[in-house]
């Protein structure tokens, strides 16, 4: 299994550096050719959202589209994919940030009855409440 770091995933999504994008694509293609899983962890996904939003000023709806396309890409596997899908679904209609949506969704997938939060917007997510 090959795990991707945030900077590699960002290159694959944004393609802003031709040399690094080629190298990232080659890494993934080689892993796939060798029948390896290419994994995107939850922490990498969270950091990627932060980098895209803060460094590249990518709007949330564009990030949502990029993440959905990555989920549909057969060459990538995601840690707790069900939670990622749920988080993206909740994020599209929420005032909460992606990280809050993913935290609540991941907790649900782990079997938590709910997520306690002091965040007013996160408390509005399905499966969360204001502590």
Predicted features by range, described:
Residues 6, 81, 100-101:
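Conserved glycosyltransferase catalytic-site signature
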Residues 5, 40-41, 96-97, 119-120:
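Histidine- and aromatic-rich ligand-binding microenvironments
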Residues 42-44, 65-93:
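Acidic catalytic patch
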Residues 9, 45, 122-123:
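A generic structural signal for short hydrophobic patches within well-formed alpha-helices
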Residues 35-36, 96, 112:
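Short, high-confidence coil segments that cap the C-terminus of an alpha-helix
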Residues 104-131:
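Acidic, PIN/NYN-like endoribonuclease modules and their adjacent C-terminal/linker elements
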Residues 1-40, 55-62, 130:
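Short, well-structured N-terminal submotif of metal-dependent ribonuclease cores
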């Amino acid at each position: 299994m090959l795990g991707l770091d945030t900077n590699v995933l960002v290159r694959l999504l944004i393609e802003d550096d031709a040399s690094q994008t080629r190298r990232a694509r080659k890494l993934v293609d080689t892993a796939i050719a060798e029948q390896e899983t290419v994994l995107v962890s939850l922490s990498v996904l969270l950091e990627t959202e932060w980098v895209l939003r803060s460094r590249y000023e990518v709007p949330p709806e564009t990030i949502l589209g990029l993440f959905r396309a990555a989920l549909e890409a057969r060459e990538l596997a995601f840690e707790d994919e069900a939670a990622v899908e749920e988080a993206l679904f909740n994020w599209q209609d929420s005032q909460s940030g992606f990280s809050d949506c993913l935290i609540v969704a991941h907790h649900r997938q782990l079997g938590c009855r709910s997520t306690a939060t002091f965040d007013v917007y996160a408390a509005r997510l399905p499966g969360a409440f204001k502590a």
